[in-house]
Amino acid sequence: MIIRSPEPEVKILVDRDPIKTSFEEWAKPGHFSRTIAKGPDTTTWIWNLHADAHDFDSHTSDLEEISRKVFSAHFGQLSIIFLWLSGMYFHGARFSNYEAWLSDPTHIGPSAQVVWPIVGQEILNGDVGGGFQGIQITSGFFQIWRASGITSELQLYCTGIGALVCAALMLFAGWFHYHKAAPKLAWFQDVESMLNHHLAGLLGLGSLSWAGHQVHVSLPINQFLNAGVDPKEIPLPHEYILNRDLLAQLYPSFAEGATPFFTLNWSKYSEFLTFRGGLDPVTGGLWLTDIAHHHLAIAILFLIAGHMYRTNWGIGHGIKDILEAHKGPFTGQGHKGLYEILTTSWHAQLSLNLAMLGSLTIIVAHHMYSMPPYPYLATDYATQLSLFTHHMWIGGFLIVGAAAHAAIFMVRDYDPTNRYNDLLDRVLRHRDAIISHLNWVCIFLGFHSFGLYIHNDTMSALGRPQDMFSDTAIQLQPVFAQWIQNTHALAPGVTAPGETASTSLTWGGGELVAVGGKVALLPIPLGTADFLVHHIHAFTIHVPVLILLKGVLFARSSRLIPDKANLGFRFPCDGPGRGGTCQVSAWDHVFLGLFWMYNAISVVIFHFSWKMQSDVWGSISDQGVVTHITGGNFAQSSITINGWLRDFLWAQASQVIQSYGSSLSAYGLFFLGAHFVWAFSLMFLFSGRGYWQELIESIVWAHNKLKVAPATQPRALSIVQGRAVGVTHYLLGGIATTWAFFLARIIAVG
């Protein structure tokens, strides 16, 4: 840490009334671009309008103006999020069986949507139990509401209205900070201030207030709910806050107030700030007292972190100093120059944030099932499967987005003249080594992982089970994974002596938590089948990385096209007369990377879905005998490609295929429709622009004959537009097909 004289204080950080509010301007399509504002000559105009509306770089080159637009757009985004949340809470208040579910969460399904009877649509309202007819929801909102202490639909109404007010506030803020008081560029670039406020404010105080809410409201209410008290009898949230005796009845140390805190006698608080590990056997969720303790600890950490960076007081860390001091023996100038990149290129900044947020989202997916945080979440199999699938897809998209914006940074913001021998320059200089090695890894992983399956299929077909790779023949046990599992299972007695159980039941240790006769979680065994599919995961992760990284590292130049930077981020080919230069733009790498991201995530969610149904989810008898949904068939069936097709895709598709005439029929229709959307994408991906232009001209001729030709000249989609439409429908169709397949299956059997 360096102590130096105070920084010169920045006085005026905003411009007043920089841009007048003009509805006339907003009403004019394409007002942000001289070309588009002229109006349409051809149908390409509408595509350009959509492509460039949010590409602020194309509106102006003034970084301050771009920053203000992005900042303002963030408020718009927050407004939409609040609106969405408000809708969710309103549905919970108006159309749901939340209060009934609260009284019996194990036998009543969550529902917050009732379909109107139009032409037989009432068939979609299934019986979710408790005399309620509706669509079973799988978002996990009911479980979150219970965990936060919501006991009535009135409280949901109030929260929904509160979210609407916040949405309006955000819309106002977006307008105000662009038109009335717009921050100067220096404000956006003041990273130390930003870090302090985000760390201490958002994460620190945010976690602290949540911990406070949990201790004062959630814990007592959940204590009553777990004991079977009728929600209408439970005191309201404000009563605990105003009346300490209510809390003291449940947690006696509350009677002492803050005395133990100031006398450092903190163990007094261990009644409601626990360190138990494992799951609450009543609800099948993490101990809420553990969660409160966790948020309090996180709050302390981030409140400290929010005081580490140097602002007006001349004390603390400076990010530029930290980055420039970051040199290794083999890294030349190290991180020198990165500070300038990250404060002048929002694409570079966004790229890092997307990569980290995407990875974090995937980590969330894995923790939601292994450490289910909310009461009765673990036994709601449809919600568990939905949450895992959702977070995996989102994570995949965010990571591809990271590569996209890294490439845009390379094309638009990277200045090679003042970058020499820093880390980025060194990576770019040995990009051939990186990409060729990565290519080798992909080929190795692809052939070997798939080869293991093909070997098994062949041996199985030839009737030689003793020669297959399986737990009963030639074993390929994941020994490292099993060692990690075992280490964690033993942790409570050894490395974490304060804990009573390990962080997750999945590690092992033999104990099982069941709620209402359903398995919440148990130790997950790993064997040869998992070893095989994990190598497919390794393969399908490395391929999109290869494609995307190649796109970033060769975004500005390559041996094939040395002046690629001049052609921009997206272009179809390097002009006429240069054959073999199509699909080389950075945009095309993102386009191709998306398909492999789709492959990668699909394998992960298939693996998860089948593994959980086979080895975890199921019912438990009074004698303690567990019957899994698919009876433990994963270990022997998933070791061949044929097994995946026959015992997973085909066997488990029976519910969605046979859903017609039942309350699940919407999933059957979606399954059909999404297949159609997916197939529709192939029309865009497999045909060229000229084919359609020819067809269009013949259709225009017919219109001219009938004197109904439009003034705007119809044009075929450009090559890039066609690919964009194609990949969108491919992903949308594929994801919606999987969604219908998963939900019809798990709602029927779960």
From Swiss-Prot:
Q: According to the UniProt entry, what is the EC number of this protein? A: 1.97.1.12
Q: Which reaction does it catalyse?
A: reduced [plastocyanin] + hnu + oxidized [2Fe-2S]-[ferredoxin] = oxidized [plastocyanin] + reduced [2Fe-2S]-[ferredoxin]
Q: Among its keywords, does the record have Protein biosynthesis?
A: no
| One Gene Ontology MF term | chlorophyll binding
**Binding locations of phylloquinone:** 692
Q: Which cysteines are joined by disulfide bonds?
A: none
**Where found in the cell?**
Plastid, Chloroplast thylakoid membrane
Alphabetized UniProt keyword annotations: 4Fe-4S, Chlorophyll, Chloroplast, Chromophore, Electron transport, Iron, Iron-sulfur, Magnesium, Membrane, Metal-binding, Oxidoreductase, Photosynthesis, Photosystem I, Plastid, Thylakoid, Transmembrane, Transmembrane helix, Transport
- The UniProt entry lists the main location of this chain as plastid
Q: What class of enzyme is it?
A: oxidoreductase
From the record, give the transmembrane residue ranges. 70-93, 156-179, 195-219, 291-309, 346-369, 385-411, 433-455, 531-549, 589-610, 664-686, 724-744
Q: Which GO terms describe its biological process?
A: photosynthesis
> What membrane topology is annotated for this entry?
Multi-pass membrane protein
Where does the chain bind [4Fe-4S] cluster?
Answer: 573, 582
Taxonomic superkingdom: Eukaryota
User: Cofactor: bound how, per the entry note?
Assistant: P700 is a chlorophyll a/chlorophyll a' dimer, A0 is one or more chlorophyll a, A1 is one or both phylloquinones and FX is a shared 4Fe-4S iron-sulfur center.
A GO cellular component annotation here is: chloroplast thylakoid membrane
Residues at which chlorophyll a binds:
683, 691
Q: Name one Pfam family in it.
A: PsaA_PsaB
Under the subunit heading, UniProt states:
The PsaA/B heterodimer binds the P700 chlorophyll special pair and subsequent electron acceptors. PSI consists of a core antenna complex that captures photons, and an electron transfer chain that converts photonic excitation into a charge separation. The eukaryotic PSI reaction center is composed of at least 11 subunits.
The entry assigns this protein to a family as follows: Belongs to the PsaA/PsaB family.
Role: PsaA and PsaB bind P700, the primary electron donor of photosystem I (PSI), as well as the electron acceptors A0, A1 and FX. PSI is a plastocyanin-ferredoxin oxidoreductase, converting photonic excitation into a charge separation, which transfers an electron from the donor P700 chlorophyll pair to the spectroscopically characterized acceptors A0, A1, FX, FA and FB in turn. Oxidized P700 is reduced on the lumenal side of the thylakoid membrane by plastocyanin.
The record's annotation in NCBIfam families points to: psaA
Q: Which PANTHER family match?
A: OUTER MEMBRANE PROTEIN, OMPA-RELATED, PHOTOSYSTEM I P700 CHLOROPHYLL A APOPROTEIN A1-RELATED
Protein name from the UniProt record: Photosystem I P700 chlorophyll a apoprotein A1
What organism does the UniProt record list as the source? Crucihimalaya wallichii (Rock-cress)
Phylogenetic lineage? Eukaryota, Viridiplantae, Streptophyta, Embryophyta, Tracheophyta
